[in-house]
Swiss-Prot record:
The chain crosses the membrane at residues 87-107. This is NADH dehydrogenase [ubiquinone] 1 beta subcomplex subunit 11, mitochondrial. Accessory subunit of the mitochondrial membrane respiratory chain NADH dehydrogenase (Complex I), that is believed not to be involved in catalysis. Complex I functions in the transfer of electrons from NADH to the respiratory chain. The immediate electron acceptor for the enzyme is believed to be ubiquinone. The gene is NDUFB11. Its main location: mitochondrion. It comes from Cricetulus griseus (Chinese hamster). Residues 39-62 are annotated as: Disordered. It is a single-pass membrane protein.
Length: 151
């Protein structure tokens, strides 16, 4: 951990010296994790730009907020922009959220879990009323199972 922090500090120092044009010492520090040499600093030196950027005198983009302070990003025309925003919010919230949650609430029983619980409760009540055990060790009636004869 300490070697890594020392490596980062040494890199920053040598890069700062190279950027400012200070003469860098030919020191090579080696550790188990990092090696810093002047050659790595020279490769990272920024090149001078060959082309200078100039601002376009004729701006193609106009500030839509100057024309319409309530700009929503749907259209350049303020009236169309407001109507598109209202349509998106109506369908996005009213239709999708309200009708979507209603649809999800009234979906049929998934994998019949509710039906299985009701059927189990009905069977328990029937067995308790008739004095039968609630659960039997045999899932199937052994008298109805036909096994092959041993030879």
């Amino acid at each position: 951990m300490a070697a890594r922090l020392l490596s980062l500090c040494a890199r920053r120092l040598s890069v700062t010296a190279a950027v400012r044009g200070l003469p860098a010492a030919g020191v090579r520090w080696e550790s188990s994790r990092a090696v810093i040499s002047p050659s790595t600093v020279e490769r990272k030196r920024q090149r001078q730009p060959t082309m200078h950027w100039q601002e376009d005198p004729e701006s193609e983009d106009e500030n839509v907020y100057a024309k319409n302070p309530d700009f929503h990003g749907y259209d350049q025309d303020p009236v169309v922009d407001v109507w598109n925003m209202r349509v998106v919010f109506f369908f996005g919230f009213s239709i999708v959220l309200v009708l979507g949650t209603t649809f999800m609430a009234y979906l049929p029983d998934y994998r019949m879990q509710e039906w299985a619980r009701r059927e189990a409760e009905r069977l328990v009540k029937y067995r308790e009323a008739n004095g039968l055990p609630i659960m039997e060790s045999n899932c199937f009636d052994p008298s109805k199972i036909q096994l092959p004869e041993d030879e």
